[in-house]
């Protein structure tokens, strides 16, 4: 299974922010949309990623307040990325090795979507369930 198959099932809904946006507004958007990450776009081009991890770190450093902190100050400027043709096993390994919970999927400089660790786990589980059903059907119909 490849990343593009997960994106196809997941859909291409993408919520973004700008580097000049306030972190407190990003928190509101993420809470309202039930998101763990936001893609940060600067004039339509990917500038970085913001996840709850960066927000929690900023809160810890600033005694629980974000004030007028801008996303450009806390976002990951050069996030680890995936490609649509990447195999899911390679994607899982990349996520585990880097600790990234969310990876932007890029092709030829174009952002196609974001894959979360949950998306990967769900896709792998569904693939395994399908294979199990097929094997059980095969075994059940095995000639005696």
Give residue ranges: language-model regions.
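N-terminal first-folded block
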Residues: 6, 11-38, 45-46, 50-62
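Tandem CBS (Bateman) regulatory domains
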Residues: 1-12, 51-96, 117-144
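Residue-level signal for alpha-helical context at structural boundaries
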Residues: 24, 44, 73-74, 109, ...
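A glycine-centered beta-loop-beta connector
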Residues: 30-33, 38-53, 95, 103-120
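The conserved cystathionine-beta-synthase
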Residues: 16-34, 41, 81-99, 106
């Amino acid at each position: 299974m490849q990343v593009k198959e997960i994106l196809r099932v997941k859909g291409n809904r993408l919520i973004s922010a700008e580097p000049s946006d306030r972190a407190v507004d990003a928190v509101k958007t993420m809470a309202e949309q039930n998101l763990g990450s936001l893609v940060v776009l600067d004039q339509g081009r990917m500038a970085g990623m913001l996840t709850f991890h960066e927000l929690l770190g900023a809160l810890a450093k600033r005694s629980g307040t974000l004030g007028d902190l801008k996303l450009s100050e806390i976002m990951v400027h050069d996030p680890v990325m995936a490609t649509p043709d990447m195999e899911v096993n390679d994607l899982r390994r990349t996520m585990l090795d880097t600790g990234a919970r969310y990876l932007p999927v890029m092709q030829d400089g174009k952002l196609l979507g974001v894959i979360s660790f949950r998306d990967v786990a769900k896709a792998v589980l569904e693939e395994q369930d399908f294979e199990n059903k097929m094997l059980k059907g095969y075994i059940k119909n095995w000639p005696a």
